[in-house]
Each structure stands twice: as structure tokens, then as C-alpha cells.
């Protein structure tokens, strides 16, 4: 028989920097999961990634206090900001433009995000990324 699931925990944790302090400790502690075991496993799996890059993770907690976790791709907004070489998006995105990305950069981001996107094909994924960029005040050239 399969293990009984008691809940899902969704967190965004910097790659290679999971530690028992908030938000990780309290979220896992209230479900009775081993916090250090998760931190070691997460840090081991993210050591090849860029340190500090926020990684969304979904932790499945089971009744016997065990857990599994699935890591997603970094948020599109982080990748877009990196491609446009800016610190943050525009406070007024439709009037103040803060940067530019090309269609090729949008395609590269869409390719990386494809497993997590609901887009039917690559063109739809590129349009999704372009929409996110526009909502941040970044112009997408060639689209």
C-alpha cells in the first residue's frame, strides 16, 4: 500500500543555501519532518546550480514522517532579469521601460522553463515569457 500523504509544502529556497532557519525550519517542523535531512538532500542536489538562485520546491510529507521533494526550474522573472542585466523590474511597466531582451533570449528562457510551463508548444512558451517580460517593463525585440 502507498504511504499516506499528509500534505504538500511549497517553498522557494536559494540553491545550495537551505538551512533550518525560516522559512524551511518552521514549514517542515510543523509537519514533524526531519529538517536537517531535507537541508542536506536539497543542498546536495543544488550544488551544481548557481549559488543563491531561488529554486521552487514542492515537498510531499507522508504520515510516517518521511518526505520526497520535487525541484522546479527557477522563476521566469529571475531569468528575464538576468538576461536583461537589470536588478529589478519597472514600478510602472507600461510607461517606463527598464531593459530589453531579444527573441533568442526569450526562446532560451522558454526552453529552460518548458517542463514547468503549461504551453502547448515552444512558440506559446516564448509568448508566455514575453508577456512576463512586458509586465516587468522589459521590451522584447523581434516579437
UniProtKB/Swiss-Prot annotation:
Keywords assigned by UniProt, alphabetized: Methylation, Ribonucleoprotein, Ribosomal protein, RNA-binding, rRNA-binding
GO BP term, example: translation
Post-translational modification: One or more lysine residues are methylated.
Domain of life: Bacteria
MF annotations from Gene Ontology: large ribosomal subunit rRNA binding; structural constituent of ribosome
Family annotation (InterPro entries): Ribosomal_uL11, Ribosomal_uL11_bac-typ, Ribosomal_uL11_C, Ribosomal_uL11_C_sf, Ribosomal_uL11_CS, Ribosomal_uL11_N, Ribosomal_uL11_N_sf
CC annotations in GO: cytosolic large ribosomal subunit
Stated role: Forms part of the ribosomal stalk which helps the ribosome interact with GTP-bound translation factors.
PANTHER family: 60S RIBOSOMAL PROTEIN L12 (PTHR11661), LARGE RIBOSOMAL SUBUNIT PROTEIN UL11M (PTHR11661:SF1)
Family stated for the protein in its record: Belongs to the universal ribosomal protein uL11 family.
Assembly: Part of the ribosomal stalk of the 50S ribosomal subunit. Interacts with L10 and the large rRNA to form the base of the stalk. L10 forms an elongated spine to which L12 dimers bind in a sequential fashion forming a multimeric L10(L12)X complex.
Protein name in the entry: Large ribosomal subunit protein uL11
Species, as recorded: Polynucleobacter asymbioticus (strain DSM 18221 / CIP 109841 / QLW-P1DMWA-1)
Taxon lineage: Bacteria, Pseudomonadati, Pseudomonadota, Betaproteobacteria, Burkholderiales
Amino acid at each position: 500500500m502507498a504511504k499516506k500523504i499528509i500534505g504538500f509544502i511549497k517553498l522557494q529556497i536559494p540553491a545550495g543555501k537551505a538551512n533550518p532557519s525560516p522559512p524551511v525550519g518552521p514549514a517542515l517542523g510543523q509537519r514533524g519532518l526531519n529538517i536537517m535531512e531535507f537541508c542536506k538532500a536539497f543542498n546536495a542536489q543544488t550544488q551544481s546550480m548557481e549559488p543563491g538562485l531561488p529554486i521552487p520546491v514542492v515537498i510531499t510529507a507522508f504520515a510516517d514522517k518521511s518526505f520526497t521533494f520535487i525541484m522546479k526550474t527557477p522563476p521566469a522573472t529571475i531569468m528575464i532579469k538576468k538576461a536583461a542585466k537589470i536588478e529589478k523590474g519597472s514600478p510602472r511597466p507600461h510607461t517606463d521601460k527598464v531593459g530589453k531582451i531579444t527573441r533568442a533570449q526569450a526562446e532560451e528562457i522558454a526552453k529552460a522553463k518548458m517542463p514547468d510551463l503549461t504551453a502547448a508548444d515552444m512558440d506559446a512558451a516564448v509568448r508566455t515569457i514575453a508577456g512576463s517580460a512586458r509586465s516587468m517593463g522589459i521590451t522584447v525585440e523581434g516579437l
